[in-house]
Design a protein with these regions (language model features):
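N-terminal alpha-helical segment
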Residues: 66, 110-111, 151
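Terminal amphipathic alpha-helical/low-complexity segments used for targeting or macromolecular assembly
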Residues: 1-93, 201-211
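Short, charged low-complexity intrinsically disordered segments located at boundaries
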Residues: 42-47, 64, 97-103, 117-121, ...
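Residues in well-ordered beta-strands of folded domains
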Residues: 71, 120, 188
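Left-handed beta-helix
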Residues: 76-127, 131-145, 155-157
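Amphipathic repeat-derived elements
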Residues: 32-37, 138-139, 150
Length: 211
């Protein structure tokens, strides 16, 4: 059986098992499915840890990324909010990730461990890394701008009216709320409750991506 068809059947079986509808068995648009599959394959092709490998649906980070892309293109190309919502909910149930189909993610990004990651409708740069428990959130209608090569380590947060410059490394537990960060720096929690910035020159995302 063609790998794409087999994967479609796999996703359909999961949707019908965990989030069935009264309309019967799920049908997925082949074109949107293949666009989503191409998007995740393209994204992981730049990840050093995955270099030389094909998309692996048993890799939770890869599969979470795929389900996001699939839900996004089912919503955008097919205008099928019901199926897109079911795929979003499946992703949330399987991986503990909150990545809504209306969020516009970049071509290249990496989900480390997916559990507890929350993405709002922010602006995301390329080649960003998101680890478990991190949050990109809004404050009323204020949403962050995340620059290229940003790395968010576990349990860090960027919330509200923030502009995070390129090549910003946000260390574990750091909360950036309604504040701009210039970029080319590592952000640490300060002893006085403020943030401490350490300048860097190297692009740290090169440890994760072939760039």
């Amino acid at each position: 059986m063609n790998k794409s068809i087999a994967l479609q059947n796999y996703v359909i079986h999961q949707l019908d098992t965990f989030f069935p509808t009264v309309e019967g068995k799920t049908k997925l648009n082949v074109k949107s499915f293949n666009i989503g599959l191409h998007a995740v394959s393209n994204s992981i092709s730049k990840v050093l840890a995955y270099r030389g490998t094909e998309f692996d649906y048993l890799n939770s980070g890869q599969y979470a990324t795929f389900l996001y892309y699939l839900s996004h293109y089912v919503w955008m190309n097919d205008s099928d909010k019901v199926t897109a919502t079911r795929i979003f909910l499946l992703n949330k149930a399987l991986h503990g990730i909150d990545l809504f189909y209306e969020v516009k993610m970049p071509k290249y990004f990496l989900v480390g461990h997916s559990s507890g990651i929350v993405f709002t409708k922010a602006r995301y740069g390329e080649y960003c890394v998101f680890h478990q428990g991190c949050t990109v959130g809004r404050n009323f209608e204020d949403r962050p701008i995340i620059g290229n090569f940003t790395i968010m380590y576990p349990n860090s947060s960027v919330i509200g009216k923030c502009k995070i410059g390129d090549n910003t490394i946000i260390t574990p537990g750091v909360q950036i709320i309604n504040r701009n960060i210039p970029g080319n720096c590592i952000v640490f929690p300060g002893s006085d409750g403020d943030l401490k910035l350490k300048k860097i020159e190297k692009i740290m995302a090169k440890k994760y991506f072939d760039i």
